[in-house]
Amino acid sequence: MRLDEYVHSEGYTESRSKAQDIILAGCVFVNGVKVTSKAHKIKDTDNIEVVQNIKYVSRAGEKLEKAFVEFGISVENKICLDIGASTGGFTDCLLKHGAKKVYALDVGHNQLVYKLRNDNRVVSIEDFNAKDINKEMFNDEIPSVIVSDVSFISITKIAPIIFKELNNLEFWVTLIKPQFEAERGDVSKGGIIRDDILREKILNNAISKIIDCGFKEVNRTISPIKGAKGNIEYLAHFII
């Protein structure tokens, strides 16, 4: 059996993806040795120990946590929109920092963890493409704070929609993933960008396109956790 299957089946996590998160975070030990490979094969005789010390429902929450520390932002009593919510790492982080309500939007289905799905401060919006966002969908509770973590699409494709439909926002913090902003030929086999100069160029280009939409960049920083394949990612802070 795979290690992630075991961790989930034994009830340590609410989903297999959450099991993978805690394995990657170094919280699972096999016979006293830390194992960070989710596909690690285990035997019936192996001793598995799970040390639960993750603050949020996924590692993504730890990424957004750095924005609170470095950017000096506050979401206390604010209505927020989490674009690309997935299992809810960003949403969980927002709630723990005092958000009044979070709209958790994702193009996928049934990914948000159970505890967030059943939290009355969370509105789950599934099977929804971020490019279709409009202010009418929020009734009278239009978000003033936006956070985003999207994959397989350039964040620059979403920026103009945010600027047009949600231009009352106080700030937007987004994860920028150079591997999804790069030209096809810039990404090496395996989907990893290893060239530091190229990565910086891709980041600057993406931020320039967002600024061209009408946003102002306030700050940027390196994400404290790399992407699933080991890519360096960034957090950027924008206002209008």
UniProtKB/Swiss-Prot annotation:
Superkingdom of this protein's organism: Bacteria
Protein name: Hemolysin A
InterPro entries membership: Hemolysin_A/TlyA (IPR004538), RNA_MeTrfase_FtsJ_dom (IPR002877), S4_RNA-bd (IPR002942), S4_RNA-bd_sf (IPR036986), SAM-dependent_MTases_sf (IPR029063), TlyA (IPR047048)
Keyword match Acetylation: no
A GO MF term: methyltransferase activity
Pfam families xrefs: FtsJ, S4
Biological function: Bacterial hemolysins are exotoxins that attack blood cell membranes and cause cell rupture by mechanisms not clearly defined.
Limits of the S4 RNA-binding domain: 1-61
Induction remarks: By sodium ribonucleate.
Keyword DNA-binding: no
GO biological process, alphabetically ordered: killing of cells of another organism; methylation
Disulphide bridges, residue numbers: none
Family recorded in the similarity comment: Belongs to the TlyA family.
CDD domains linked: AdoMet_MTases, S4
Keywords: Cytolysis, Hemolysis, RNA-binding, Toxin, Virulence
Gene: tlyA
